[in-house]
Regions:
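N-terminal Rossmann-like NAD(P) cofactor-binding subdomain of oxidoreductases
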Residues: 1-172, 177-179, 271-279
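C-terminal substrate-binding/catalytic lobe of Rossmann-fold NAD(P)-dependent oxidoreductases
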Residues: 13-45, 57, 145-146, 150-151, ...
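PAPS/PAP-binding and catalytic site of the sulfotransferase fold
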Residues: 118, 235, 302
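Short amphipathic alpha-helical segments
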Residues: 127, 228-231, 298
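Active-site catalytic microenvironments for nucleophilic, acid-base chemistry
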Residues: 134-138, 219, 305-309
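Helix N-cap/coil-helix junction residues
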Residues: 140-141, 195, 312
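NAD(P)-dependent Rossmann-like dehydrogenase/reductase catalytic/cofactor-binding core
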Residues: 269, 276-312
C-alpha cells in the first residue's frame, strides 16, 4: 500500500534533498502544498490529515508549531495523527521522541521502526555520537572526560544565507564559528552519549558545499587503563558490526582525510589515527567521523528513518 508523505519545508536545503531522494522510492507518494498556502494553517492542517507521515524541515519554533497543529488535528478528528520525522533540533532530547540514529545502540533501530515521532540527529552530533558512545559503553572513556570536538562542514550546513554568501564569493575560504561555545548540538551529544562533562565543540566551515569531518582528539596515556589505538578501533568495530551505513575503516598511511569523499551518500566512516608508541611516552589518538552533512547528517538519515518507520 502506498504511503503518503508531506515534507513541511520542502523548499529548504534539507527538504529539497529529501524530496529528491524520495521521488524514486517505491511505495511512497509525495504530497505538496501550493506555494501560496504554505503559511496558511488551515490548508496545512487539512493536508496533514490526509498523509501517513510528515517530515518537518523547519526552524525549531516552526517545527514546534507544526507538531502542535498535528496534536490539535488528532484531538479534533479522533483519527490517528500522522507519524512525524523532525529534522530540526526542537525535539532531540525530548523524552517522548525517539532519537533517529538507528545505530546508537542495540534496539534503537527497532525503536525507530515502531516510533510515532522521530527526531533526526544533527549533522555534527551524528559524527560525535558515533565516535563517543561506543567508547563510553566499552568502558574506555569515562563519561566525565574533558573532550574537544574540532569539526568542519561544507557551507550548505549554514542554510540559505551561508550558501548564497559562499556561492557569491563574499565569504571567507575557512571560518571558525560558534565561539560563544553554546552550540545547539552539544545537549544532544551529551544526552545520547552519556557524557556528564560538556565537551568543547569547535565548529568551522570551509569553502566546499557538502562534506563533514568531526574530530575527537584523545590523550590515551591520561585515560584509565591507557587504551591503545587497537582497543579504540575494536570497540568501534564491535559496536557497528553489521551496520549497512556506519563502517569502521583503517587509518590510511598518508595521514590525511578528504572531507568530500562521501558527498551524496548516507554513509558514515569512522577512523582511528594514533601515535601510541611514541618514544617520549605520550600516547595520542584522533578519531575522525566522515560524512555528508546533508546525507547521513540530514536528508539521508531522514529517508533511512522513514524507510524503517514505514517498513520499506
Amino acid at each position: 500500500m502506498t504511503k503518503k508523505i508531506f515534507i513541511d519545508g520542502e523548499a529548504g536545503t534539507t527538504g529539497l534533498q529529501i524530496r529528491e531522494r524520495l521521488q524514486t522510492l517505491p511505495g511512497v507518494e509525495l504530497v505538496s502544498i501550493e506555494p501560496h498556502l504554505r503559511k496558511d494553517p488551515q490548508a496545512k492542517r487539512a493536508l496533514m490529515g490526509q498523509v501517513d507521515l510528515v517530515i518537518l524541515c523547519l526552524h525549531d519554533d516552526a517545527a514546534r508549531e507544526s507538531v502542535a497543529m498535528i496534536d490539535e488535528l488528532a484531538a479534533s478528528s479522533g483519527k490517528p495523527d500522522p507519524r512525524i520525522i523532525d529534522a530540526s533540533s526542537a525535539h532531540r532530547v525530548a523524552p517522548d521522541w525517539v532519537f533517529g540514529f538507528p545505530e546508537l545502540s542495540a534496539g534503537q533501530e527497532a525503536a525507530v521502526a515502531s516510533a510515532q515521532r522521530v527526531s533526526n540527529p544533527g549533522c555534527y552530533a551524528t559524527g560525535a555520537i558515533a565516535l563517543i558512545r561506543p567508547l563510553i559503553d566499552a568502558g574506555l572513556l569515562p563519561p566525565d572526560t574533558p573532550l574537544s570536538l574540532p569539526s568542519v562542514t561544507g557551507y550548505s550546513g549554514g542554510g540559505r544565507s551561508m550558501i548564497e554568501a559562499y556561492e557569491s564569493g563574499s565569504a571567507p575560504a575557512f571560518e571558525v564559528y560558534g565561539l560563544g561555545l553554546k552550540h545547539k548540538h552539544v545537549p544532544e551529544i551529551m544526552h545520547h552519549t552519556g557524557l556528564t562533562r560538556r565537551p568543547l565543540f569547535i565548529p568551522a566551515v570551509g569553502n566546499f558545499r557538502q562534506g563533514m569531518l568531526v574530530q575527537l582528539p584523545l590523550h590515551l596515556d591520561s585515560l584509565p587503563g591507557k587504551p591503545s589505538a587497537r582497543d579504540l578501533h575494536d570497540a568501534l568495530t564491535k559496536h557497528y558490526q553489521g551496520s549497512a551505513w556506519v563502517t569502521v575503516e583503517a587509518a590510511n598511511p598518508e595521514g590525511k582525510l578528504d572531507a568530500l569523499a562521501l558527498v551524496d551518500t548516507n554513509k558514515l566512516e569512522l577512523r582511528v589515527f594514533a601515535n601510541d608508541a611514541a618514544k617520549d611516552g605520550f600516547s595520542h589518538a584522533v578519531l575522525i567521523a566522515r560524512l555528508d552533512n546533508l546525507g547521513k547528517g540530514a536528508s539521508g538519515a531522514a529517508v533511512q528513518n522513514l524507510k524503517l518507520m514505514l517498513g520499506l
